């Protein structure tokens, strides 16, 4: 007897007009998470999730593709305006922001929330190349 095929349930549309885009740009990858005002995740994407591997993940183009993907998923839920919080030293910061604006979102504010230690933990040893 053949098993019935499992039905794929489509996510319900959330109808959230404004939200916050968190762009975490490290030296190795760029992650974009779009949340509502309370911090509940609406959509997310990263350079690695878009199929880039190794050193290609850290490129501005990979960040742009990831931001376009996260923006497309968020706009399916009816999102129109965004506040952008950028953190980290990576090369994908500006290109991710530009891609979010090009996707048709109105960016109301841009904040840099990169954490800077006030002499906290001891840093790892310097790389000698």
From Swiss-Prot:
Single annotated GO MF: structural constituent of ribosome
GO CC, one annotated term: ribonucleoprotein complex
InterPro entries named in the record: Ribosomal_uS11, Ribosomal_uS11_bac-type, Ribosomal_uS11_CS, Ribosomal_uS11_sf
Keywords, in A-Z order: Ribonucleoprotein, Ribosomal protein, RNA-binding, rRNA-binding
Gene Ontology terms describing biological process: translation
Pfam families: Ribosomal_S11 (PF00411)
Family under the similarity heading: Belongs to the universal ribosomal protein uS11 family.
Assembly: Part of the 30S ribosomal subunit. Interacts with proteins S7 and S18. Binds to IF-3.
Known role: Located on the platform of the 30S subunit, it bridges several disparate RNA helices of the 16S rRNA. Forms part of the Shine-Dalgarno cleft in the 70S ribosome.
The protein's name: Small ribosomal subunit protein uS11
Source organism per UniProt: Methylorubrum extorquens (strain PA1) (Methylobacterium extorquens)
């Amino acid at each position: 007897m053949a098993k019935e095929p499992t039905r794929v349930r489509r996510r319900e549309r959330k109808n959230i007009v404004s939200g916050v885009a968190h762009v975490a740009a490290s030296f190795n990858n760029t992650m974009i998470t779009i949340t509502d005002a309370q911090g509940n995740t609406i959509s997310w994407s990263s350079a690695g999730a878009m199929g880039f591997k190794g050193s290609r993940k850290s490129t501005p183009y990979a960040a742009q593709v990831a931001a376009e993907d996260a923006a497309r998923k968020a706009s399916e839920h009816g999102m129109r305006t965004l506040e952008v919080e950028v953190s980290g030293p990576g090369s994908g910061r500006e290109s991710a922001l530009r891609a979010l604006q090009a996707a048709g979102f109105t960016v109301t504010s841009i904040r840099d929330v990169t954490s800077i230690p006030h002499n906290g933990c001891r840093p790892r040893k310097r790389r000698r190349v």
